Amino acid sequence: MSELMNLNMVLPEPLNLPFPARASLQELGRVHFVGIGGAGMSAIATLMLKAGIPVSGSDRAETATIQALREAGARVYTPQDAANIHDIDTVVISTAIHEDNPELIAARAQNLRVLHRSEALAAAMGASQVVAVAGTHGKSTTSSMIAVMLDKLGFHPSFAVGTVIAGYGSNARLGATGEGSWFVAEADESDGSFVRYQPAIAVVTNVEPDHLDFYETPERVYEAFNRFVASMTPGGVLVTCWDDEGARALAERARDAGIEVVTYGQSTEADLRVSRITSHGSESSATLRWSFECASKHYEGEQDAQLRVPGIHNQLNAAAAFITALLAGAQPEDAAAALYGFGGADRRFTLRGDVAGIKVFDDYAHHPTEVFRALETGRTVADGHNLYVVFQPHLFSRTQEFAADFAQALSKADRSYVLDIYPARELPIEGVTSELITGAGFSEVHYASDAAAAIEDIAMCAVPGDIIMTIGAGDVTALGERILHELHARYLKE
């Protein structure tokens, strides 16, 4: 086992588990997903349907995702009920499904095979070479970029990512299979299960403490990423960002353990340097220069890269994708052309509409660093005009840990409205409310107990050229349409 594993720590499950062999997709038989409508679960279900596996599933309520799965051939029930567990061989759950779930209880009683979501995804990977993208931020966009690049370069990869890719209308696709094929996966670190994929290329965009409701301490987060890198196939390559302190430390530990590492960033010390970054509306450009050795091969060159998405962070994400393409055998100019083919990912600075020159964007950011980057991009696109934000904190534990950091990030807007916390899987924590953020001393950041009032206020203040953003991992995304409606009512009455 790699030197990366030599830390004397007792970690929460499943981090203490050995790296398991992948199950065969065919041996799973008829598969039922408990919570099939989630981003990760729906992607795996889509892959299995395309592979001809009988799929059923359940969720708490009807959604567009569930309807799409039905149209693809899945049998989906709402709500969840023990009676749904029949004529199946394997049940797939995520960490969000607790032991008191009626369907899981029924599956246990029937002695059915129960797999974690990550085990099911590993089975779907089959014999493909895996590119697994992890990181506290940017993994959905970066994995989507890599999938699009490899596809446009003719590799016909399979992919499973955490967002719908523009131009593909899906978060998953079954491409070429078998030896020599590629599978691009977003590797979610939130519960430590990302050690199951055994990638040939592991991309780590950044490493910061997050998901402390699971990990409890920052040290456990860092150890989980150690395990992720150690889980690579023999001869695997770590691609990571030298600009990020946590990722840089991971790269140094990996190199000390004899693992191949290629770094990227704006730093002159990075193996691939990103420079001359400029933005033009919703597009951006940069110059990439690289010189490194990997697997006994020398890589060196310079290439201009144009993206159809804005922001410094996206140019860094693109650098990771570009290196991946080089390692897969692509020519630099072809890789750059393929990068321009990436049209964005859903809820990643996604334009929801434009009324009288006022643009409304939506973003999934839910960590202070992500919020800062989203607002930084918004500021660039606003180009001197005002930036208004409606932010919904995600999880009580995250709000408690990062309240002051959220406030500082949100102060980058001209005015930010903070809604009540979206609890997701958590119960309330005494004393933890959105007012921890709004009370941190930034005059631009305001508490909004009434979303309707915040929307009305923004619609009255915004003028042509301004940018409005809805930000968060909860249901704040639905407010974009309401904001557009208010803007229509104000500007387009006639």
Predicted segments, located by residue:
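N-terminal leader/targeting and accessory segments in enzymes
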Residues: 1-120, 245, 270-276, 310
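Beta-strand->loop->alpha-helix junctions that form or flank phosphate-binding loops
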Residues: 58-60, 77-80, 115-122, 160-163, ...
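C-terminal helical cap/extension that packs against the catalytic core
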Residues: 407-464
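Short internal beta-strands
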Residues: 53-60, 237-242, 388-392, 412-423
